């Protein structure tokens, strides 16, 4: 079986796909899916999904995916799973960036990072053998784990709170008010790289 070394971003995307975080997306997107999601925020089957989920590969490594049933994924020198490639393609990055972010200039961190991705994209299902601990992963619950917690606690009404900022007193006030009205509160911090100043 061919293998490829993947980045931390790719590793986290593999985990999110495999554990169902990106539901209803179950595999790295093909060209039609990426274009439809970027232009209309829906999958070809008309289910809503806001952002392309892609697996990028360099020109040097793309040969590892050609005529392969599956390709081993290596992260931090350990095999973490495999990808079953279904399609290899090149997309129009400027067009995708314009559709997703509203412009295609490199002064936006998301656009800049997207432009830094490799030339080729591979679609296909991923299987992850085991999560490698990365700082916060012990607090990262899969959708199925969250559903079990909700069942165990017998919550009937649940509200979500999503933030990209460090929690402060205003957040605490809002969360306490929400818990007066709802059985449970799920906090979803958006964690990622920040723009360098």
Which residues does each PLM region occupy?
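Nucleotidyltransferase catalytic core that binds NTPs
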Residues: 1-197
């Amino acid at each position: 079986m061919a293998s490829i070394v993947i980045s931390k971003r790719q590793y986290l995307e593999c985990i999110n796909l495999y554990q169902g975080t990106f539901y209803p997306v179950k595999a790295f997107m093909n060209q039609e899916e990426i274009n439809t999601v970027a232009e209309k925020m829906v999958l070809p089957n008309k289910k809503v999904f806001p952002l392309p989920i892609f697996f990028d590969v360099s020109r040097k490594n793309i040969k590892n995916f050609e005529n392969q049933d599956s390709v081993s994924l290596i992260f931090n020198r350990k095999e973490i799973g495999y990808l079953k490639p279904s399609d290899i393609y090149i997309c129009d990055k400027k067009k995708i960036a314009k559709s997703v972010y509203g412009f295609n200039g490199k002064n936006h961190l998301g656009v800049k990072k997207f432009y830094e991705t490799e030339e080729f994209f591979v679609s296909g299902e991923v299987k992850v053998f085991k999560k490698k601990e990365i700082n916060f992963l012990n607090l990262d619950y899969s959708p199925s784990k969250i559903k079990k917690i909700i069942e165990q606690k017998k919550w009937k009404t649940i509200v979500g709170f999503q933030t990209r900022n460090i929690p402060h007193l205003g957040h605490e006030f809002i969360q306490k008010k929400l818990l007066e009205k709802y059985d449970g509160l799920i906090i979803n911090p958006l964690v990622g790289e920040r723009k360098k100043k």
